[in-house]
């Protein structure tokens, strides 16, 4: 059941501007809109091109279910930026042939979000010698789509767990124990998020809002979102 996350406009703008700074849409670039509007990542496709010089290409509904049609569209429209959940990315990678690789040469960034990205998927992605970089993005809707970013590379294809990276600009991440104790580097704890990207709370659900959006003990006057996810800082 949808929780009714109340996201502020300025939080959306912050996310979109940081994406543009990190993964710019240049004059001849294009991003593919193929994500259903009920999934928060669709916001980055619908409006992400506002801050760059590229363009938006709208895919027909269900295009992901037709890998060959997707490959043809990437080639025809010279798509440079594209989003996948890891499970769908794995399905797409399984369908790529040597001929298809030629159709994917326009890609610059392949974004993976919404699920854990496996080392198997990373290994397969880089086995195709595509020009694109695979980006691992993490963030609940409560932090306005993305909170952290990690650029994968060919050398990490044997890793068991893929890092989620560091917070994007204007977002802070805390690894805590019992809410008010910061965990040392390398020690697991609950991942909490604060900063400009934080949502206002849940619509008409004050109890859940109070439970998940707590006072930030490390930044007085600010709120902190409890993700419930375990994480640790790498050395």
What is the role of each PLM region?
Residues 1-8, 12-15, 25, 31, ...:
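A generic "structured core" feature
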Residues 3-32, 40-80, 150, 154:
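Conserved AMP-binding/adenylation subdomain of ANL enzymes
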Residues 6, 40, 58, 64, ...:
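Short aromatic/basic micro-patch
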Residues 9, 35-37, 42, 56, ...:
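Generic structural signal for small/hydrophobic residues in well-ordered secondary structure
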Residues 11, 37, 42-43, 69-70, ...:
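Acidic donor-diphosphate engagement hotspot in glycosyltransferases and nucleotidyltransferases
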Residues 12, 119, 127-136, 151-235:
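AMP-dependent adenylate-forming
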Residues 24, 39, 63, 118, ...:
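Nucleotide-sugar-dependent glycosyltransferase donor-binding/catalytic pocket residues
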Residues 51-55, 79-83, 93-163, 172:
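Gly/Ser/Thr-rich phosphate-binding loop
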């Amino acid at each position: 059941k949808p929780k009714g996350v109340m996201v502020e406009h300025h939080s959306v703008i912050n996310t979109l501007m940081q994406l543009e700074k990190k993964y710019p849409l240049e004059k001849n670039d294009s991003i593919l809109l193929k994500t259903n509007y009920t999934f928060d990542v669709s916001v980055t496709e619908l409006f992400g091109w506002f801050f760059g010089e590229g363009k938006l290409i709208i895919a027909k509904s269900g295009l992901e279910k037709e890998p060959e049609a997707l490959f043809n569209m990437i080639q025809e429209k010279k798509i440079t930026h594209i989003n996948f959940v890891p499970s769908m990315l794995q399905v797409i990678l399984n369908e790529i042939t040597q001929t298809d690789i030629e159709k994917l040469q326009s890609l610059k960034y392949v974004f993976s979000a919404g699920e854990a990205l496996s080392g198997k998927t990373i290994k397969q992605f880089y086995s195709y010698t595509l020009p694109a970089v695979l980006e691992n993005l993490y963030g609940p809707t409560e932090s306005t789509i993305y909170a952290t970013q990690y650029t994968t590379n060919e050398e990490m294809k044997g890793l068991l767990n893929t890092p989620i990276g560091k917070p994007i600009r204007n977002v802070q991440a805390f690894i805590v124990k019992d809410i008010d104790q910061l965990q040392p580097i390398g020690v697991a704890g609950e991942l909490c998020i604060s900063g400009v990207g934080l949502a206002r709370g849940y619509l008409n659900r004050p109890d859940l809002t109070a439970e998940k959006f707590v006072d930030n003990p490390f930044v007085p006057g600010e709120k902190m979102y409890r993700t419930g996810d375990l994480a640790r800082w790498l050395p």
